[in-house]
Every structure is written in structure tokens, then in C-alpha cells.
Design a protein with these regions (language model features):
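Ser/Thr-centered flexible coil motifs
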Residues: 36, 127-129, 177
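Conserved interdomain linker/interface between the two RecA-like ATPase lobes of SF2 helicase motors
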Residues: 1-119, 163, 170
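Ser/Thr-glycine-rich phosphate-binding loops at phosphate-binding pockets of nucleotides
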Residues: 1, 197-204
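Conserved helicase ATPase core of P-loop NTP-dependent helicases/translocases
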Residues: 150-200
Length: 204
């Protein structure tokens, strides 16, 4: 299956994310190795907009980097454009809308993975159907039965873990017990968990 490479851009938290091709397409609609001019122009527009919001003008490359003999802005640093990285829940919501799930979102931080799940839950995203929720509960109950005591389940915040699974979300990292990672892998393989926020512990 060919790998489609896209970039999701969001101007701010109040606007819908935009999905743009990373590379240009040829006359046959196939991606080339050249960067998409539309993407470059869009990012440039956002940079200029961010600079205006800060009361700064984007420096003209022909004139150096702005004020002062050093050719730089305040404190000797070139002005930095704001990042245009969409919120994680917004990325998931857009991918779901486009029918591009299940998916894996790699985050190189255990806390980052857990926080991403919470962000999606708090945003009210639900990626599963009633039928899928029933299947998730059955599989989770089967895998947990006899493996952990009630005290263990409480200490591991099992109810929170299970609720996220039922909504279609999961973390996967070395800070989780092996059983929880196995549950996530099983549900993802069966297409029941739609988005996994993972560190390098999840092999493709």
C-alpha cells in the first residue's frame, strides 16, 4: 500500500485544521519528491499573520534580520514565528473525519502519551460504535480475568484505562504493565482502538 504523506496545519485553536500534501503531485496525481508549493505558501501566510499579531513585521531577507547593527531584533535574536502545530485532539478529529483511522501517533514521552489520551477524552471525542464498545469490554474482561486483584486494578487506574479504550484511545509505553500493553495491541490489531499514542515501544 502506498504511503501518503500529509501535513496538518492549524492557524489557531479556533479554526479547523487543514490537511495539505507534503509533496507536489504530477499529472497522474502521484506524489513527487518536490515539496508542495501550496503548503509552503500557507505556512508563510501563517508566519506573517503571527508576526502581525505580535506587532512585528517579518524581516526582509535582503535587509538582514531587522533592527540594530547586528541585523537582529530585540536582545540580538531574530524574531521567531509561532508554531502552527495543531492540538493533538484536533489532529485525531480531522483524521477521523477523513476516514484515515486507525492510526498511531508517536510521542517520545510517556507523560505526553498519557496526556494526549486525556486531551482527546476531555475534548469529547468518541471514535467507537456501540458494537465496538461491547467487543472491547469482552476482550478486556477476558484478558484481565484472574491476572490482577481488585487492589491492583485500583492502583493501576484500570477504570480510567478501560474508559479510554471504550472511546477508542490508548497509550502504549514502557511505563505501562505488560498486560495493559498487550490489551492495547490486541484491540489495535482488531481495529477497535482507533488511535494509539505511543513511544518507540510499539513496533509496526
Amino acid at each position: 500500500m502506498p504511503l501518503e504523506q500529509h501535513v496538518i496545519v492549524q492557524a489557531d485553536e479556533y479554526t479547523e485544521p487543514e490537511v495539505l500534501d507534503l509533496y507536489r503531485r504530477d499529472g497522474n496525481g502521484e506524489q513527487t519528491t518536490k515539496l508542495n508549493a501550496e503548503l509552503i505558501n500557507r505556512l508563510d501566510q501563517l508566519d506573517r499573520k503571527a508576526a502581525r499579531r505580535r506587532g512585528e513585521e517579518r524581516p526582509d531577507k535582503r535587509k538582514g534580520f531587522g533592527r540594530g547593527r547586528g541585523g537582529k531584533g530585540a536582545k540580538g535574536h531574530a524574531p521567531k514565528a509561532e508554531r502552527h502545530t495543531p492540538r493533538r485532539w484536533a489532529v485525531v478529529d480531522e483524521l477521523n473525519f477523513l476516514g484515515m483511522l486507525p492510526g498511531i501517533y508517536f510521542i517520545f514521552s510517556r507523560n505526553g502519551c498519557d496526556q494526549a489520551v486525556e486531551q482527546c477524552i476531555n475534548a469529547g471525542l468518541e471514535l467507537t460504535t456501540d458494537e465496538e464498545v461491547t467487543r472491547i469490554r469482552r476482550i478486556v474482561d477476558e484478558m484481565v480475568e484472574g491476572q490482577l486483584t481488585q487492589e491492583d486494578l485500583k492502583a493501576l487506574q484500570f477504570s480510567k484505562f478501560r474508559f479510554a479504550l471504550e472511546e477508542g484511545f490508548a497509550s502504549h509505553h514502557a511505563g505501562m504493565i505488560a498486560l495493559f500493553r498487550q490489551i492495547v495491541e490486541r484491540l489495535f490489531e482488531e481495529g477497535l482502538v482507533k488511535m494509539v499514542f505511543a513511544t518507540e515501544t510499539l513496533a509496526l
